[in-house]
UniProtKB/Swiss-Prot annotation:
NCBIfam families: PRK00431.1-6. It holds the Pfam family Macro. It comes from the Bacteria. Residues 1-174 form the Macro domain. Transmembrane segments: none annotated. It comes from Mesorhizobium japonicum (strain LMG 29417 / CECT 9101 / MAFF 303099) (Mesorhizobium loti (strain MAFF 303099)). Belongs to the MacroD-type family. This is Macro domain-containing protein mll7730. GO terms for molecular function: O-acetyl-ADP-ribose deacetylase activity. SMART domains: A1pp (SM00506). CDD domains: Macro_OAADPr_deacetylase.
Length: 176
C-alpha cells in the first residue's frame, strides 16, 4: 500500500491550471456545467467543451465520461457525477467510491499518466468532507496499488483546510 501512497500528491490551488494528462470534473448528470468546480472547468475550457458534452447524453451518478481538455493545460477532462449527501444511508459511499474507480479506469484506458481530482461531492452536494476524503484516498490507493497507470494522482484542494483532511487520510492509511 505504501508504494501506492507514494504516487498520491496533495495540491492546494486551481484545478483548471494544472498541467496534467487529465483533470476530473465533479459534474452534474447533464454534463453541461454548473456551479463550483464544474462551472470553473467549463468556463476555462471554453464553448467547445459544452458542444462535446452535449453529444455524451449525460452521465449517471457514480459513472464517468471523458472529453478533450480544449483550452485547459490538461489533455482530457474526466467528468464524474458524485452523489448528493442524503444522510449516508442511501448508498452514497459506494457511489462516491465508484466515481473515483470509474475515473481512474477511464484515465488508464486513455493512457493518462497523471490525473487530478477535486473533492467530489463536498460542495453543493454536501458530502461531509472528512468522510469523502477517506473514501477518496482509500479508493484511489486500492485502485493504483493494482495498476501501473495513472502513475501520479493529485488531489487538488480548493483550500488549505481540505488539503489537511487529505494529508490526514493519507497518513492514516500509512499507519495501517
Amino acid at each position: 500500500m505504501s508504494k501506492a501512497l507514494d504516487r498520491i500528491r496533495i495540491h492546494t490551488g486551481d484545478i483548471t491550471k494544472l498541467d496534467v494528462d487529465a483533470i476530473v470534473n465533479a459534474a452534474n448528470t447533464l454534463l453541461l456545467g454548473g456551479g463550483g468546480v464544474d462551472g470553473a472547468i467549463h468556463r476555462a475550457a471554453g464553448r467547445e467543451l459544452e458542444v462535446e458534452c452535449r453529444m455524451l447524453n449525460g452521465c449517471k451518478v457514480g459513472d464517468a465520461k471523458i472529453t478533450k481538455g480544449y483550452k485547459l493545460p490538461a489533455r482530457h477532462i474526466i467528468h464524474t457525477v458524485g452523489p448528493v449527501w442524503q444522510g449516508g444511508g442511501k448508498g452514497e459511499a459506494e457511489l462516491l467510491a465508484s466515481c473515483y474507480r470509474s475515473s481512474l479506469e477511464l484515465a488508464a484506458a486513455n493512457d493518462c499518466r497523471s490525473v487530478a481530482f477535486p473533492a467530489i461531492s463536498t460542495g453543493v452536494y454536501r458530502y461531509p468532507k472528512d468522510e469523502a476524503t477517506g473514501i477518496a484516498v482509500g479508493t484511489v490507493s486500492m485502485v493504483i496499488e493494482e495498476k501501473a497507470m495513472p502513475e501520479t494522482v493529485i488531489f487538488c484542494c480548493f483550500d488549505e483546510q481540505t488539503a489537511q483532511l487529505y494529508l490526514r487520510a493519507v497518513a492514516a492509511l500509512r499507519k495501517g
